[in-house]
């Protein structure tokens, strides 16, 4: 079968032929129809320090996808051949304390699809049936293919009550932009997002941001004054991993505010801890998606009118993957979709 693989320890990926995976007793085989390019895939493409330490070579990668079940193991229940599914990319052990307590997103033995094991940039993917998630017919393949990052945005944004609250989002990547739409959908008052990328800030405006602020030209304090925010933001969603963005967020938070951290800052990042302590801030780290509460919430929000269509900006056939990755690398895109139906 065709697959996009890391074949050598160097930048780039290669469209190549690999062996079709085998189905275990508790697995499903999915014929892939659409995939999306993630920021993780960009790290793998660039072959940066993280990728060099993490990604086995050779291996085909990718973890944002949708497809159709074409084969099932003999122990699988609850699915049928022909079911349209996406799937949870974190494969958990099922036996550690957190897994047994229903907190699988906190499994200490997590294995990542397309990171630690063969991924979804291929004609076929095999995963445990437990990880597969049926997609309702009214949700398009393109939207279903981005459930992984949509889930990151959902997990982060819904970590705290947003009804009537003022929300600051730092980082207008696709996940931050989707968090804008989620926050507005569930009843936030002001949703302000910051970045230095004008293209993506404009996407955030289309998704409902009250203000999309280029912090290289505009002061967040001035924006708060324009919005008559005398006390600061109630909730912060840090999506960038940029130390200066997190520092600015801490300064802009109201006393008693709550912050969810999805972005990964450098290991030695220093912050002003007096902002955290004297303001009584609550900070929560976010990893992946809650299994499977986040997935049910994603479907429910789409079915109740959440519109994510502006984030789907570019579509390519898989044979044009180099152009697709160049588009993503340019920074002037939302989500980039790869079509595998002609592979």
UniProtKB/Swiss-Prot annotation:
- Relay the cofactor remark from the entry: Binds 2 Zn(2+) ions per subunit.
- Pathway, per record: Amino-acid degradation; L-threonine degradation via oxydo-reductase pathway; glycine from L-threonine: step 1/2
Give its localization. Cytoplasm
What keywords appear on the UniProt entry? Cytoplasm, Metal-binding, NAD, Oxidoreductase, Zinc
Active site located where? 40, 43
GO BP, one example? L-threonine catabolic process to glycine
Q: What is its main location?
A: cytoplasm
PROSITE patterns for this protein: ADH_ZINC
Q: Where is this site: Important for catalytic activity for the proton relay mechanism but does not participate directly in the coordination of zinc atom?
A: 148
Which cofactor names does the annotation list? Answer: Zn(2+)
Which cellular components does GO assign to this protein? cytoplasm
What reactions does this protein catalyze? L-threonine + NAD(+) = (2S)-2-amino-3-oxobutanoate + NADH + H(+)
SMART domains, A to Z: PKS_ER
What Enzyme Commission number(s) appear in the record? 1.1.1.103
Looking at the Swiss-Prot or TrEMBL record, what is one Pfam family this protein matches? ADH_zinc_N
Q: In which residues is NAD(+) bound?
A: 175, 195, 200, 262-264, 286-287
Gene Ontology MF: a single term = L-threonine 3-dehydrogenase activity
Which annotated residues bind Zn(2+) 2?
Answer: 93, 96, 99, 107
Q: What does the UniProt record say this protein does?
A: Catalyzes the NAD(+)-dependent oxidation of L-threonine to 2-amino-3-ketobutyrate.
Protein family per UniProt: Belongs to the zinc-containing alcohol dehydrogenase family.
Q: Which HAMAP family match?
A: Thr_dehydrog (MF_00627)
What is the protein's quaternary organization?
Answer: Homotetramer.
**UniProt protein name:** L-threonine 3-dehydrogenase
Source organism per entry reads: Paraburkholderia xenovorans (strain LB400)
